[in-house]
Amino acid sequence: MLVADDGAGIDLGGRRLEIRHTRGHADHHFCIWDEASRGWFSGDSFGISYPWFRFPGGDYILPATTPTQFDPQAYLESLAVLEAKKPQRMYLTHYSELEFSQDKAEQLRRQVLAYREMAPGHAQDKASLEAALADYSLGVMAGCGPREDEAALREMLAFDMDLNAQGLMVWQQRTGAGG
């Protein structure tokens, strides 16, 4: 086992990788910077982007606000750490490689901020929070160009909206946010 401090470097077959502690999604989370590819192995810190959410006008990326340690401010700070390297690509855990753009980072940042603002209005009603998150996500997707049937997209979002709503509710209970 290797315990890596924030900013630690690891030599992997002559290739230097930098470890950055990126809280927000979870306290234990870290990302790995690969200077050679100018890419981040971002885990869930740069969100989730399913292949079916890649549209002609752009990719839809949704934040991962899952329980139990989601912290919106730390998420935004971690996003800034990732952006500071001026990456060319992000290697997402869910799913695959994405070309980095400031627009994608801004899309993710706006969603985290919107989630943080939406959550208190649904503090005791997970179903209504899920619906609000899905409605918001569909609105963001609309900016990415032509889409499939909205009911099908809503169904594709359901699993993540459930997890994200749980994470937001746990965050509110843990911190007293919005209450």
Spans of features found by a protein language model:
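Generic structural signal for short, solvent-exposed loop/turn connectors between secondary structure elements
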Residues: 1-2, 9, 38, 121-129
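Metallo-beta-lactamase
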Residues: 1-23, 27-100
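A short catalytic or substrate-binding loop motif that flags glycine-/basic-rich loops and adjacent residues
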Residues: 2-4, 23-26, 159-162
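Generic detector of short, locally flexible boundary/turn motifs and exposed helical patches
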Residues: 3-9, 54-59, 133-134, 146-147
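Internal alpha/beta domain cores that form substrate/cofactor-binding pockets in large enzymes
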Residues: 68-85, 90, 98-137, 155-156
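C-terminal regulatory/interaction regions
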Residues: 121-179
